[in-house]
Amino acid sequence: VAARKAFLDGGSEAQINAAYLAAAGHTDSDVPYNNIVALNENGATLHYQYKSFARPDESRSLLIDAGAEVDGYSADITRTWARDDELFGELIEAVDREQQALAHKVRAGLDYRQLHLEAHLRLGSVLKALGIVDMEPDAMLQHGVTSTFFPHGLGHPIGLQVHDVAGYSDVDGQ
């Protein structure tokens, strides 16, 4: 909430990061990983690490991937916000809906690989519905199109290790 407010108030990446840290009760040195705070085009750079002190002329979007820690338990909080861009706002809302629907399917014993593939198919459906990609979702998956928009794994063990590796392993960890 604090990061979103700083973004909407026109803050710089550094100011948005400072607002997040203050709200989380942390400093840069005690978060579980370096926060990613990216305005506008910077959000397209995977693991963007620069937090500019300069306020952009126009803040159109914010991507924040920030950590927090309580009693040795690490959390990874990732959010994206858009301002004054109807299509991007619709994309964010649609991806949020699909993420929540997929999260509700998680059960003990469910194969992670199936969820990972379903996430790509759901993303493909969103991209097609919004007219961003003119292909069927299964064709997008087959040709690696969804990987352009989703270049990482579905998730990772929060609290144990806060970085995931793209792809997936079999039940024996291979």
Q: Each predicted region: which residue ranges?
A:
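Active-site neighborhoods and metal-handling regions in enzymes and metal-associated proteins
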Residues: 1-174
